[in-house]
Amino acid sequence: MSSQAVEALKLIHKQVEKVIQQIDDGDWARDSLCEGWRVQEVFAHMSSNMKEAINPTPPPETEQEPLKAEDAMEALVAPRREWTAQELLDEYAQYFESWIEWMTALQEEPTASTMVPLADLGTYPLHMMANAFAFDHYCHLYVDILAPEGPLVIAVDSGNDEMIRPGIEWMIAGMPQMQAQELAAVVTRPLEIELTGPGGGTWTVQPAGHDGLITVPPRANLGASATVTSTAHDFVSWGTKRSDWRSTCTIDGDEAYATTVLDTLNII
């Protein structure tokens, strides 16, 4: 199950609290690395997701087409764009503990193994919601908000294995479904991904099977045409197209093939 991901969320929260204690008034309006969002919108995204899990907004009276994941996130952020920083912090504080309790409950069977669709991201067991948010919060804090990639120079603890690994597991789990057609078209031979440092491991991206989906088993030595190596932390950035993989990855083997796959990859 994903109890480790719940613990990751608690650890990341401690670092969020350090940012809250040190952030200046002017920092809220600074552009984050997340395209189109200031630091304020990143916090609004985090707090609004907690609120919706615990106290969901009633659905519209008239049936509407389901939103894509990124559009749904923007829909929650939009009404909070003009909130004060204190209003965002109050919402975050109000719902965090209940949200963690909810995440913990999702680790218990039979709920944990219940498969649910997540907009256009694919279908996953409910226990992996904790992994999804461990990825989300780590990425937004350590990549979008904090230097060197984000705008704020604030002292926090470095990301460790306990913080990073659950989010990496979400990224790997999402690769087959989030870009099902795009990746199936370009993954024609095994490609090894070796992530070093905290949160790291080795996976081999395999061509699509009869179901049309690639697979990403957690092992190496599967006849890979190339091996792509970077830190796990950097994977959070380049795997989501926040940065160019060329700045942090090395390739051993068929560089042209690896380049085609990496240029296509875009995890949400």
Where are these regions (language model features)?
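An N-terminal domain-cap segment
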Residues: 1-44
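Short, helix-capping/interhelical loops that line the mouth of catalytic, cofactor-
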Residues: 1-4, 52-105, 109-114
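Alpha-helical transition-metal enzyme core signature, strongest for iron centers
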Residues: 9-16, 39-54, 78-85, 89-103, ...
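Short, contiguous alpha-helical
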Residues: 29-70, 117-179
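A glycine-rich beta-turn/hairpin centered on an aromatic-Pro dipeptide
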Residues: 165-207
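Acidic/His-leaning functional-site neighborhoods
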Residues: 196-225
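C-terminal interaction segments
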Residues: 219-268
